[in-house]
Swiss-Prot record:
Belongs to the Mediator complex subunit 31 family. Residues 121-146 are annotated as: Disordered. It holds the Pfam family Med31. This is Mediator of RNA polymerase II transcription subunit 31. One of its GO terms (cellular component) is mediator complex. It comes from Candida albicans (strain SC5314 / ATCC MYA-2876). Transmembrane segments: none annotated. Component of the Mediator complex, a coactivator involved in the regulated transcription of nearly all RNA polymerase II-dependent genes. Mediator functions as a bridge to convey information from gene-specific regulatory proteins to the basal RNA polymerase II transcription machinery. Mediator is recruited to promoters by direct interactions with regulatory proteins and serves as a scaffold for the assembly of a functional preinitiation complex with RNA polymerase II and the general transcription factors. GO terms for molecular function: transcription coactivator activity. It is found in: Nucleus. Residues 126-139 have a biased composition (Basic and acidic residues). Disulfide bonds: none annotated. The gene is SOH1. Component of the Mediator complex.
Length: 146
């Protein structure tokens, strides 16, 4: 029965309800949207785009960036694929950074610094892996055998 008219629900209404439910269930959750947005901050040209389009002049947007700091907590950050986005999120808390990121040279410098950091981290990981592979395995003796 329909709550509004005390009439039985038609097949068409059932179908429409099912379609509506499927649509609602297919939409991303707030958590998913925020995860995607926070990770998009690792894209420096996108951050520059936000500056060029005056997002950083909107107090509501600045408050939103502050709210997103919860992603720095381990229970949330473990879901990040691009953890450097947290570094950018932290930088965006600073008004001077928000003003400077609109500058193309500043943006390029930041991108170059990030690439150097990635390369350095990759080299460090390669060296650590090589050291692990070259470690001598201690000889294990079982019950007095050689």
């Amino acid at each position: 029965m329909s709550a509004q008219t005390d009439q039985p629900i038609t097949e068409q209404q059932k179908k429409e309800q099912e379609q509506y439910t499927n649509l609602i269930n297919s939409l991303p959750t707030r958590w998913e949207i925020e995860l995607e947005f926070v990770q998009s901050l690792s894209n420096i040209p996108y951050v520059n785009y936000l500056a060029q389009n005056n997002y950083f002049n909107d107090e509501n947007f600045i408050n939103y960036l502050n709210y997103l700091q919860y992603w720095t907590q381990p229970e949330y950050s473990k879901f990040l694929v691009y953890p450097n986005c947290l570094h950018i999120l932290k930088l965006l808390q600073d008004e001077n950074f928000r003003k400077n990121i609109i500058n193309q040279d500043f943006m390029n410098s930041l991108m170059n610094d990030m690439v150097k950091r990635w390369q350095s981290n990759a080299n460090d990981q390669d060296e650590n892996k090589e050291k692990e592979e070259n470690k001598e395995v201690p000889e294990v003796r079982i019950n007095g055998t050689n």
